[in-house]
Structures are given as structure tokens and as C-alpha cells.
Amino acid sequence: MRKPSLLPIITEKTPGAAGGIQRAKQIQGGPAGILYGQSFHFVIKSPNKGTESTIQPRRLLPPLKEVSVVSRIGIVIKPNKPEALALAREMIGWLNQKNIRVYLDTAVAASIHHAPSCPQEEMSKCVDLLVVLGGDGTLLSAARHMEEEEVPILGVNLGGLGFLTEITLEELYPVLERVLEGKVETEKRMKLHAAVIRQGRTVGEYAVLNDAVISKSILARIIHLRSSVNGAYVTTYRGDGVIISTPTGSTAYSLAAGGPIVYPAMDSVLITPICPHTLTNRPLLIPDEATVEFTLETEESDVRLTLDGQVGCDLLPFDRVVIHKAQKHVSFIKSPFKDYFQILRTKLKWGER
């Protein structure tokens, strides 16, 4: 694996009452001016000669990883989308010419008469790379089934907004060429684990890439959710519900509810209230190692937990929803042609009048 070159150590001394602070930093260069794996090393020098203390370096952003050799590629497509089927046929021919073995999701393999196929929930055991043709919803569904974090996902946008499926049709084959040459990098995204506990028994467990949403299902009534972080009481949310999202999900429902945009490679958990009755309830960002718990204190039973907008379960009064960081990540292929901030500018139309 090619290692990023290290820039020279920069030493800077600032005068101070205690004899000054000498700072040295060694950084790894990254694309577009972003310093991946950047760390700072501080040496505090005392007026007494021969004594100093060191603050250990802290990584600000996780390093990107290069993709290893790819010989088996899986393709997952959005069902009943003709352009996705046509593109899959075209990709299979292109990849076969390069001696790449292609696996299709069993649910759609028969429709284009292709073999071999593999159930989506087992795809991570069959392939070195998963290509998703569709929108963010298709990618979210595929990511939930990826058991092995070593298998990266390349999302190709055939849908609408496409925050997760960041590769365009025009970029698809140039990116695939780079993948086969080992010249692209992956970025790990954290997932959440959500559990529903009813009368002391776990009745449901879920993997979450974007967000977990606790909300009223039908009737327009205020629901009460008692919240705690690591066992410490935070507040009781009164409103339409609450969104618990990953940094990846911060540009989804949470953003529409007034939450901030969180850089997707960060490890943190975002809690965003939905239409809170108490106007001082604001979004809350907590560390990724924290466990957050919500207890439904509403007597009505028309409240639902929804995961990534696709699966979920009905909640009963006094059910507890416990959420923490999942053990495994999801790896995405990074676009070599644009960075995250270019994607934000394009998708959110920043600067347009």
C-alpha cells in the first residue's frame, strides 16, 4: 500500500510567561487541501532546564485507505428501474472483458439472464467490491446487508439528490478503471446499533447507516420521550419525535429538521428534535462512544421507530430505545474527481442566487 509522503516537521515557538511553548507538527498531505490523518504534537517546556511535558498527538480526521486488488464485483440495482437494468448489462460486458467475475443480486439476476448471482444479504462474502446503481435509498438498503466492512461500496447516482451515491454516470467507468488499478481510496462511515427493549426483553435489533427516527405514526399528538446519555438524564422531549443520526445521516431528515451538517468521516452521534414544543430544545452532538437511551412516556401506542426510512417497528408505552455506535463500519469509494465540499455545494446549491 502506498503511504502518503510526510511533509517536513514545522517547529514554532511562542513566548509565554512559563518560558514559552514550542510546537511541532508533522502532517500528511491529502487532496484538496484536507489533511487526512493530521496530528499535532505539543511540547511544553518548563523554565527549569531538562523538564518538559508532552501532549500526545490526536488524529483530527481518519486516514483514507487505498483499495486492494479487485477480482470479483457485485452489482445491486434499484428494482423496476429500466435504466439501472440497462446499465447493469453494459457493466457486465465491460467487466467481463477485463476478466472480472460479476455477481448480481439474486432478486434481479433472472431479469437480465445473468449468472452467477448472490442474495444481497450474503453479497459481502462473495465480492471484493459492491457497485450500487440507484439512489441513496438503494445504497442504504445494500449497506445494511454488508456484514464485512472490508468490502467497499461504490454508489452510482441514478436517483435524485444522491448524497451517498456520489459517483455520476459520466464518472462511472473512469472510476472503475481506477478501482481495478488500485488508484482510488475508501472512507469509513460509522453505523449505529439500535435496540428496542420491552419489559426487560430485547424485541428488535437494527443496524443504521443514516438515522433512527422515533415519531408519531398517524395521529397528530405530542409524544413524550425521556432521554439519557450514558445513564445521565438529558431532557424529556415533547413534540413530534426525535432523530438520532450518524454524521452520514446529518444531511438527511436531520438537516430538514434544523440539524447541522456533520463531516461524514467523523465519529459522533447527532440528536435532533422534530418540531419540539419547547423551543429551547436544540440539536445535540455527542461522542460516538456514548450510549443514548429514549423511554416512551406517552400512553398512546401510535409511535413508531423507523430505521433509515425503510424498516422499523411500532413502540408501546414505556418501551426503551437504546442506541450506540455499531462495532463495524461501512466503507465507501471516494470520488477521485470531487471532494465532499464540492458535493455539498452542488447538492445544496450553495452560493446560487
Per-region residue spans from a language model:
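Short glycine/serine/threonine-rich phosphate/pyrophosphate-binding segments
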Residues: A84, G137-A142, T251-A256
